[in-house]
Amino acid sequence: MKLQLVAVGTKMPDWVQTGFSEYLRRFPKDMPFELVEIPAGKRGKNADIKRILEKEGEMMLAAAGKNRIVTLDIPGKPWDTPQLARELERWKQDGRDVSLLVGGPEGLSPACKAAAEQSWSLSTLTLPHPLVRVLVAESLYRAWSITTNHPYHRE
């Protein structure tokens, strides 16, 4: 199974690249984790936000292909670390690759939400999207460590 983070935005601060890359390199060869960056639509005074969301959503769904789609969204289910580890095990048993979708400033398109088999809420707080990348990578790595009895996670 391959994990894929599909996120809107392409120019992240160095600390995001460093943090995300650190967890990326830790993932085992049998569970590769990749980042697919979707260019954010141009926003401005007269921007058609609905159209921008649609376009970003189309690109996200195209990147996900036939993968299981999990959206990251405030109204999603709040999984604690052991629950995320159980979800990771279910995903592995399912046999499909998994795409986790992170929207842009206005969130996810209705099409992305409709295509999702699951929706995961990291927090009821509004989080900066660059930080979400690092949080997701660390959370998935920690969940993997639980499923393999790796010493990274401690109770």
Swiss-Prot record:
It catalyses: pseudouridine(1915) in 23S rRNA + S-adenosyl-L-methionine = N(3)-methylpseudouridine(1915) in 23S rRNA + S-adenosyl-L-homocysteine + H(+). Transmembrane segments: none annotated. It is an enzyme of class 2 (transferase). CDD domains: RlmH-like (cd18081). GO terms for molecular function: rRNA (pseudouridine-N3-)-methyltransferase activity. The keyword Protein biosynthesis does not apply. Keywords: Cytoplasm, Methyltransferase, rRNA processing, S-adenosyl-L-methionine, Transferase. Pfam families: SPOUT_MTase. Its main location: cytoplasm. S-adenosyl-L-methionine binds at residues 72, 103, 122-127. InterPro entries: Alpha/beta_knot_MTases, RlmH-like, tRNA_m1G_MTases_N. Its EC number is 2.1.1.177. GO terms for cellular component: cytoplasm. It is found in: Cytoplasm. Homodimer. PANTHER family: METHYLTRANSFERASE, RIBOSOMAL RNA LARGE SUBUNIT METHYLTRANSFERASE H. Belongs to the RNA methyltransferase RlmH family. This is Ribosomal RNA large subunit methyltransferase H. It comes from Klebsiella pneumoniae subsp. pneumoniae (strain ATCC 700721 / MGH 78578). The gene is rlmH.
